[in-house]
Amino acid sequence: MQKFAFRPLRAALFFALLVSSGFAAAQGLTVSPAQLNFGTVLETQPDSLPLSVTNTLTRTVTVTDIRFYTTYGAPAFSTPYRWFTLAPGASNTIWVKFSPRHNIYHNSELVIENDGLRGYPHVDLVGQGRYSNAYYDSTENKSEEALKTAIKSTTTNGSISLGYNIARDSMFMLIDNQRRNGQGATQNTLESVYTGQLVVGYTDRTDAQTNYGFNTEHTFPQTYFNSLEPMKSDLHHLFPCDDISNGQRGNNPFAEVTSPTWSDGGSTSDGFRFEPRDAHKGRAARAMFFFTLRYQNYNGFLTSQENVLRNWHAAFPPDAIDRARNEAIFALQRNRNPFIDYPQFIDRITSISTLSTAPVLRSLDPMQDTIIYGSVLPAATTVYTFVVVNNGNTAVSFSNFNLTPTPVLSFAGTGADTTIGPGDALALQIACTPSTMSAVNGLLTFNTNVPGSTSFSVPIYANDPIFSAIDEADRVNLRLYPNPAGDAAWLIADNILSGPVYAYDLTGRSLGQLPTQQLGNRLQLSLAGLAPGCYLLGLHTNAGPVFTRVVKE
């Protein structure tokens, strides 16, 4: 999910106060530091920082996954350490990498999923992405209209209008001449961008035009800007083209043509719309984007085609030919096409053709749908950390926190209303202090301002026979791998395993026996009959059942 955070560095928000010295129970997994601040990192030079994860419990804990969130649909933070086991009191150092695709301030979260029954620790991740090409410094931390304005200024300031004759001569003889531009031709060679037709052996532009039927395609048709300079001679939207396909394109918008009346070399037209061959779709899209931001959307020409051009831009990204062409034009014209250098700029502009405003996205990712303590000793306080991440692009408000039953369940701090910003996490610490070993079946409820998710109800279980039996899995060193799992997983123990395995949902309802295959101290389980979700697996031995949890993907 997209993460937008163009603001100064700040500490991660903790909803609950830290547990006081009166709380005796261990907190499960702990992390250090609580925040990884990567500083400024270039897109060409990713950086990594260490994170220490410690098991404070008296039983083994397995880290089942490390969850990250995306920035404009792509991950900026990552780690290769996604699954590992920690013995009681043990620590492990993992390295987290920051690889920014965008030159913006990143604010995100890392959440460590585990089977320790004390909640999931989270780590605040912050860093400033920066582009190695200083030409784009003015675009840093900008999006939507502010980014469009920065791109317009960047591509305008210092640029040179060559004039139409010089621009065309440069295109025919240097920029797109495959003998001169590194494409390996031994003679002057041009390729029509729409049909792939080649002109070989021409002597100059006039020769190519007069004797070979080639001319210059204006990707944004010059009719719409009255053939005025500097638009007419801007090389970023000029391409060599044969006369026939150029005429077929005419002033028509780009589109996907389903019933063509003309086709050649992969390009098609129905007389009203024009679809270029695949080799030119991405280039046409980026030329249109550049032109509209550098100048304007004359006569609204881009508006009807922007969506299909965005699709082509994504499907046909810039290649070495595009990058070399961009460099050659920069050497002559002193400006660049930003969508060739950094195609991801498009992710930060909702609309090129009209007023660009990011849609408001309120979204939450609660880490668990059920709070399970396992066994909790009487008169001792055990704390569970319930984490919710704001993975939208606007602040989310929380209100009306409530726990039942009380005083067995209480907030380790305060249950006051609060608000968390995009990229932040709410870490709600819930204390369980039973007076006996009797089962505790409780409920956490709260409200938010997220459409479709205004009310949350999270079941809480402690000393429940089926959930407490999960602890027994650690005492017999029963392990499940992989977890999360697909359609198959392995139960592994120090001794020979025997007995049927049953699956249960989180209410304790039996879902039936699972198919198994015994291989020494391992049991291969078939999970194909389970839908994606979280389940309990019970190995029924002669000494009684032993339970562990699995996440089915």
Predicted regions located by residue number:
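Residue-level detector of functionally pivotal "anchor" positions at catalytic/ligand-binding pockets or at interdomain
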Residues: 353-367, 444, 461-481
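Surface-exposed, proline-anchored Ser/Thr-rich loop/turn motifs
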Residues: 375-376, 469-494, 503-511, 532-534, ...
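Domain-level detector of nuclease and nuclease-like folds
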Residues: 206-358
